[in-house]
């Protein structure tokens, strides 16, 4: 049994070798010749999986180690009788922590408290729901927009997108990319929406590049609209609008979900799905794969305020480490993908063991996803 895996899927060689012969290949572009005798293909979001790639090939199963699936033609796979699995929620925590790292940086730079801001979350799935929970744990007001969930009758205080635009100081997008249909998200943030944002608002896109109309956004910024922008995703990736990059406050190369934990979850989820598909079901404990974190434990004295939280968050991950390299190589062919391929190891907040002498600080840090314990000062 021959299994092709994206060369940038961590732990893929070791795990899938339990099931067959493993060959690691680049994801963009996939070497088509390798598909001629392969039984399974494991990809990431950079690989377009459709009829033109797989027609006439012996592939029986496709797995994507990503939460999003807009790069996969699921309808064609089903029609062709090819098994499929994604990894829903695998990188949700990573994306939430990317958003926090960005917001805390902007708050420090511009001198505002997040408690004084209302955050509008567009798309309340694995990422949006976790983001809501962590923001509300800090006492930050959130507004939610998710029309598909409203139509399904899901519980929640959902608002219209117009309401979020009118009332939110921060608008962050966490939707799939739907190019048509009743829940179309292509250019959901169009020129009209962008112009309608509150003066001084923050716009964040960490889902799919085309959810925000990049041309319209650049037009508004060039005209002097007072707006802070965080973009992790771009229309036309791996190409991007270099002029737009110069105008945004934070620009990164589609790495919001790139924690070691998130990548490992993606790999293990598709591994488990494929093992079940071939009748040799196996389960993997994530902590058996992950290395020891860089920082073993730290001690926090006193209560948790925003500056302290910012220092803790940036101790684990400071978004600026990914902004500067992209600006340095933007526009050079191949460099966008190279930044992703050679991405420095990044951990999640749970990797940081925090000993607190303040019980409320320990409790709050646990709600935020840190590994925190309370030890009273002696």
UniProtKB/Swiss-Prot annotation:
EC numbers, comma separated: 1.1.1.290
Single GO molecular function: 4-phosphoerythronate dehydrogenase activity
Binding site for NAD(+): 146, 175, 232, 257
Enzyme class per UniProt: oxidoreductase
Keyword Oxidoreductase: yes
Pathway, per record: Cofactor biosynthesis; pyridoxine 5'-phosphate biosynthesis; pyridoxine 5'-phosphate from D-erythrose 4-phosphate: step 2/5
Reactions it catalyzes: 4-phospho-D-erythronate + NAD(+) = (R)-3-hydroxy-2-oxo-4-phosphooxybutanoate + NADH + H(+)
A GO biological-process term: pyridoxine biosynthetic process
HAMAP family: PdxB
Family: Belongs to the D-isomer specific 2-hydroxyacid dehydrogenase family. PdxB subfamily.
Subunit record text: Homodimer.
Protein name: Erythronate-4-phosphate dehydrogenase
Gene: pdxB
């Amino acid at each position: 049994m021959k299994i092709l895996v994206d060369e940038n899927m961590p732990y893929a060689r070791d795990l899938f070798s339990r099931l067959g012969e493993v060959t690691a290949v680049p994801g963009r572009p996939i070497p088509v010749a390798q598909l001629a005798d392969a039984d399974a293909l494991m990809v990431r979001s950079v690989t377009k999986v459709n009829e033109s790639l797989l027609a006439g090939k012996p592939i029986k199963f496709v797995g994507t180690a990503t939460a999003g699936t807009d790069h996969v033609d699921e309808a064609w796979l089903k029609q062709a009788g090819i098994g499929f699995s994604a990894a829903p929620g695998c990188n949700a925590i990573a994306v939430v922590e990317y958003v926090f790292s960005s917001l805390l940086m902007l708050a420090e730079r511009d001198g505002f408290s997040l408690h004084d801001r209302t955050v509008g979350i567009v798309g309340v799935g694995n990422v949006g729901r976790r983001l809501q929970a962590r923001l509300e744990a800090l006492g930050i007001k959130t507004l939610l927009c998710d029309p598909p969930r409203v139509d399904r009758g899901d519980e929640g205080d959902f608002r219209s997108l117009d309401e979020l635009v009118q009332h939110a100081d921060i608008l962050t997008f966490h939707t799939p990319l739907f190019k048509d249909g009743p829940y179309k998200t292509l250019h959901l943030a169009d020129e009209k929406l962008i112009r309608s944002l509150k003066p001084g608002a923050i716009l964040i896109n960490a889902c799919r590049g085309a959810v925000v109309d990049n041309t319209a956004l650049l037009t508004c910024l060039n005209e002097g609209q007072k707006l802070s922008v965080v973009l992790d995703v771009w229309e036309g990736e791996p190409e991007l609008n270099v002029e737009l990059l110069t105008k945004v406050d934070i620009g990164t190369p589609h790495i919001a979900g790139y924690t070691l934990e998130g990548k490992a979850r993606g790999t293990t989820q598709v591994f488990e799905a494929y093992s079940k598909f071939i009748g040799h079901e196996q389960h993997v404990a994530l902590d058996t794969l992950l290395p020891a974190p860089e920082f073993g434990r730290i001690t926090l004295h006193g209560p948790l305020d925003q500056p302290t939280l910012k220092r803790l968050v940036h101790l684990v991950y400071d978004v600026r480490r990914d902004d500067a390299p992209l600006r340095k190589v933007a526009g050079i062919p191949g460099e966008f993908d190279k930044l992703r391929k050679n991405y420095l190891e990044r951990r999640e907040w749970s990797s940081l063991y925090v000993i607190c002498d303040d019980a409320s600080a320990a409790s709050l840090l646990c709600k935020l996803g840190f590994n925190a314990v309370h030890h009273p000062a002696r």
